[in-house]
UniProtKB/Swiss-Prot annotation:
Residues linked to a glycan: 140, 233, 390, 470, 652, 882, 925
Disulfide bridge map: 82-109, 92-108, 103-127, 533-558, 647-658
Impact reported for residue 711 to R: In POMPE; uncertain significance
Catalysed conversion reaction: Hydrolysis of terminal, non-reducing (1->4)-linked alpha-D-glucose residues with release of alpha-D-glucose
Propeptide position ranges: 28-69
Binding of substrate, residues: 404, 600, 616, 674
UniProt source species: Homo sapiens
Effect upon mutating residue 705 to P: In POMPE; uncertain significance
Protein name per Swiss-Prot or TrEMBL: Lysosomal alpha-glucosidase
Any GO molecular function: alpha-1,4-glucosidase activity
Length: 952
């Protein structure tokens, strides 16, 4: 095959011509090098849905040769072309099982596999492409303002209908670390994901990558400039671009790949013939199944610890196939190929570069980081009030009380029943008076079965034309909790205004604080609609990904139903995201404060508007353990506000399981205990006193750490950082961290090692190079209103060379370690964040061997909008060096200026100090333990004023 380097700029055309002639004489094809250096001009943008006009629909008829169904002249593969290593074989029968004769009629090779890989989901293909299989040819490659353009032509049709034989390639060198290319039909506008991405006006002058093109068969090769490593090579298999089947394959530089959520799987995906299906579905987390969200982004680790990422901006139903060579194939059922490559080179940078495209996470209100409690079955305000009272009596923190469907009248949105919930508004007001917040479930499906004039949300929605329609132009009617239902089209601007009105009107009755949006894949209890679905190409595409149920209509609405921007075939995976955007905006309008939305269904960019909970998990040890990689995965995808239902949702928990889940859940960024209708009670107060004490201890620790957690969310919001993160993100050069997914970090500083198995009193975790201090030697409980747990002997520090360590983990303990070199702020825990925010604060200072450490505190009123734009916040940097701790005041306002610092705990003080000074004044109230090397200093300082604490 011929490989082309990008062409020259016009300024150097003459030089290039000489080079070209000489090279052509030797090689028979042209090699051109690009020397274009143009200053980069970027205009920032917010990744929000555009209001665009409908595009060409997949499945529509096309005139001319693209409709060709016969494939005359397709060459048969000869035996020598079929000598392809088994792990490098790309499937020539992705659509169905075929015979040898049918395979060879496609021009492909047929060799039955001797034995599949153990544990493989699919197995190697028997029918596979030979290297000579016809693909597209690159023509008219030229330089552009942003990079390169070219035409791609195919002369031989594929075995899928409606091949698009002429394509346009646009390569955009957007930034030094981001390459973007699209492949689309130049003659007909096709559906593109309506997610606004950054607008760039000129190519990057000094990219970290180089781009090469294979002429025939066409392919793109992307290398890392530093070492020449190939990050993307699409020449490994032929390109397909038919109306309803697009396939792009690439080699991978290693088998260590993560992303492509949402699935129940380890953090690192298996490359042993694994198929990952992206088509959002209401299904309790099950291995190998398509679940609630679709995120077509992966991060790949490379030898030495570098990393890169690839994002296919495509929302159609798709499969992603991983194979052992290693390689990956994208198989989409529509749209265009819109590909971003992020160069990193650090894994952390890859995540930030991805979020530069899809959007940084929203900043949650402070109360949203407290403990949330819910269950399906709180069937009255009396029962709900009793739950809150029981939590208070048992001295458990509780910030947000929730209700499931029970509050509704006939399970209809924006209503409450006048039996058990007749005093619903008063109950919510009482929660507010106690410093708590309230949330309830809101499903997207709107009841359509009542008589006209009986249910305003449907009547008004029908009048405004906000619902998804069927082929007759009438609202598509499915079945969900209230019975017959219509589905709002959140891509319709009219529907956004209608949703805002419905939210505001209900908020006028019941002053709720946040929205729990469920069933928004969208879920449907029947297949398609009450009238079925049409028999057309959108309902029966030539390629159906590996969806549970076997059809695109399974557990959802008809793919051919109509929305404002396009068909549901194209927009299905965006339904949860568009509802999250609508709910985010509606809460801002109704409440005038920071919105808090938790959604089940997600797509790329979701974290900018809402959080996520991982759905209907079972109360099992297996799903407890699986929650860790799930939480880590969503943080890598820019959705840091994520958690699983503590103690599990389906089935009955056990006391031990619920204790261990509460301990882990205390370190979910979003913590909610939620339970199913028929399951045994699992509120913390439902268990024995020893179990309650263990849970109380975990919740106490979470509340003490909330200032640090809030600061991490601020860093995520402004800089694209993760909150909970896998070890490899901080220690990428240590390959032992790459597969660790039963531990997690909070930011850079805290390492959490939970117990995830039954009957265990110890746990083994990996500790990267450095010193790790046991955080539970820091006694902060005395600062707040919660009783301190009983003291237990602890190993004060682990000095690791990068090793596995076995730790004691009795039932009342979760191991949390503070990394040397970091300072974290803590606060006295209360029963609510309203209470805890009034408590004095402490600093935990973890010194390196050189005696240094650094930390940060971000503080505002916890719920106002635009605090950064208005400067209504306090930000403080803490530094330790030479036996001295100081604070640097980045910004101080009334919010945070009066925060009291009452204690400084210094970990790793080698020798007993003779004197401690606070702002130059001797401190008499300090203690030092020669066994633990911990120095405790009682002070009386203000965070918002400069201070200096020293010892000698």
């Amino acid at each position: 095959m011929g490989v082309r380097h990008p062409p020259c700029s016009h300024r150097l055309l003459a030089v290039c011509a000489l080079v070209s002639l000489a090279t052509a004489a030797l090689l028979g094809h042209i090699l051109l090098h690009d020397f274009l250096l143009v200053p980069r001009e970027l205009s920032g943008s917010s990744p929000v849905l555009e209001e665009t006009h409908p595009a060409h629909q997949q499945g529509a008829s096309r005139p001319g040769p693209r409709d060709a169904q016969a494939h005359p002249g397709r060459p048969r593969a000869v035996p020598t072309q079929c000598d392809v290593p088994p792990n490098s074989r790309f499937d020539c029968a992705p659509d169905k099982a075929i015979t040898q004769e049918q395979c060879e009629a496609r021009g492909c090779c047929y060799i039955p596999a001797k034995q599949g890989l153990q544990g493989a989901q699919m197995g190697q293909p028997w029918c596979f492409f030979p290297p000579s299989y016809p693909s597209y040819k690159l023509e008219n490659l030229s330089s552009s303002e942003m990079g390169y353009t070219a035409t791609l032509t195919r002369t031989t049709p594929t075995f899928f209908p409606k091949d698009i034989l002429t394509l346009r390639l646009d390569v955009m060198m957007e930034t030094e670390n981001r390459l973007h290319f699209t492949i689309k039909d130049p003659a007909n506008r096709r559906y593109e994901v309506p997610l606004e991405t950054p607008h760039v006006h000129s190519r990057a002058p000094s990219p970290l990558y180089s781009v090469e093109f294979s002429e025939e068969p066409f392919g793109v090769i992307v290398r890392r400039q530093l070492d020449g490593r190939v990050l993307l090579n699409t020449t490994v298999a032929p390109l397909f671009f038919a109306d309803q089947f697009l396939q792009l394959s690439t080699s991978l530089p290693s088998q260590y790949i993560t992303g492509l959520a949402e699935h129940l799987s380890p953090l690192m995906l298996s490359t042993s013939w694994t198929r990952i299906t992206l088509w959002n579905r209401d299904l309790a987390p099950t291995p190998g199944a398509n679940l609630y969200g679709s995120h077509p982004f992966y991060l790949a680790l490379e030898d030495g610890g570098s990393a890169h990422g690839v994002f296919l901006l495509n929302s159609n139903a798709m499969d992603v196939v991983l194979q052992p060579s290693p390689a990956l194939s994208w198989r989409s059922t529509g749209g265009i190929l819109d590909v971003y490559i992020f160069l990193g080179p650090e894994p952390k940078s890859v995540v930030q570069q991805y979020l530069d495209v899809v959007g940084y996470p929203f900043m949650p209100p402070y109360w949203g980081l407290g403990f949330h409690l819910c269950r399906w079955g709180y069937s009255s305000t009396a029962i709900t009030r009793q739950v809150v009272e029981n939590m208070t009596r048992a001295h458990f923190p509780l910030d947000v009380q929730w209700n499931d469907l029970d509050y509704m009248d006939s399970r209809r949105d924006f209503t409450f029943n006048k039996d058990g919930f007749r005093d619903f508004p008063a109950m919510v007001q009482e929660l507010h008076q106690g410093g708590r917040r309230y949330m309830m479930i809101v499903d997207p499906a709107i009841s359509s079965s009542g008589p006209a004039g009986s249910y305003r949300p449907y009547d008004e929605g029908l009048r405004r034309g906000v619902f998804i329609t069927n082929e007759t132009g009438q609202p598509l009617i499915g079945k969900v909790w209230p019975g017959s239902t219509a589905f709002p089209d959140f891509t319709n601007p009219t529907a956004l205004a209608w949703w805002e009105d419905m939210v505001a009107e209900f908020h006028d009755q019941v002053p709720f604080d946040g929205m729990w949006i469920d069933m928004n894949e969208p879920s449907n209890f029947i297949r398609g609609s009450e009238d079925g679905c049409p028999n057309n190409e959108l309902e029966n595409p030539p390629y159906v990904p590996g969806v549970v149920g076997g059809t695109l209509q399974a557990a959802t609405i008809c793919a051919s139903s109509h929305q404002f921007l396009s068909t549901h075939y194209n927009l299905h995976n965006l339904y949860g995201l568009t509802e999250a955007i609508a709910s985010h905006r509606a809460l801002v309008k109704a409440r005038g404060t920071r919105p808090f939305v938790i959604s089940r269904s997600t797509f790329a960019g979701h974290g900018r508007y809402a959080g996520h909970w991982t759905g209907d998990v079972w109360s099992s040890w297996e799903q407890l353990a699986s929650s860790v990689p799930e939480i880590l995965q969503f943080n890598l995808l820019g959705v840091p506000l994520v958690g699983a239902d503590v103690c599990g949702f389906l089935g009955n928990t056990s006391e031990e399981l619920c204790v261990r889940w509460t301990q882990l859940g205390a370190f979910y960024p979003f913590m909610r205990n939620h339970n199913s209708l028929l399951s045994l009670p699992q509120e913390p107060y439902s268990f024995s006193e020893p179990a309650q004490q263990a849970m109380r201890k975990a919740l106490t620790l979470r509340y003490a750490l909330l200032p640090h957690l809030y600061t991490l969310f601020h860093q995520a919001h402004v800089a694209g950082e993760t909150v909970a993160r896998p070890l490899f993100l901080e220690f990428p050069k240590d390959s032992s961290t790459w597969t660790v997914d039963h531990q997690l970090l909070w930011g850079e500083a805290l390492l959490i090692t939970p117990v995830l198995q039954a009957g265990k009193a110890e746990v083994t975790g990996y500790f990267p190079l450095g010193t790790w201090y046991d955080l539970q030697t820091v006694p902060v409980e005395a600062l707040g209103s919660l009783p301190p747990p009983p003291a237990a002997p602890r190993e004060p520090a682990i000095h690791s060379e990068g090793q596995w360590v076995t730790l004691p983990a009795p039932l009342d303990t979760i191991n949390v370690h503070l990394r040397a070199g970091y300072i974290i702020p803590l606060q006295g825990p209360g029963l609510t964040t309203t209470e805890s925010r009034q408590q004095p604060m402490a600093l935990a200072v973890a010194l390196t061997k050189g005696g240094e450490a650094r930390g940060e505190l971000f503080w505002d009123d916890g719920e106002s909008l635009e605090v950064l734009e208005r400067g209504a916040y306090t930000q403080v940097i803490f530094l330790a060096r030479n036996n001295t701790i100081v604070n640097e005041l980045v910004r101080v306002t009334s919010e945070g200026a009066g925060l009291q610092l009452q204690k400084v705990t210094v970990l790793g003080v080698a020798t007993a100090p003779q004197q401690v000074l606070s702002n130059g004044v001797p401190v008499s109230n300090f203690t030092y333990s020669p066994d633990t090397k911990v120095l405790d200093i009682c002070v009386s300082l203000l965070m918002g004023e400069q201070f200096l604490v020293s010892w000698c």
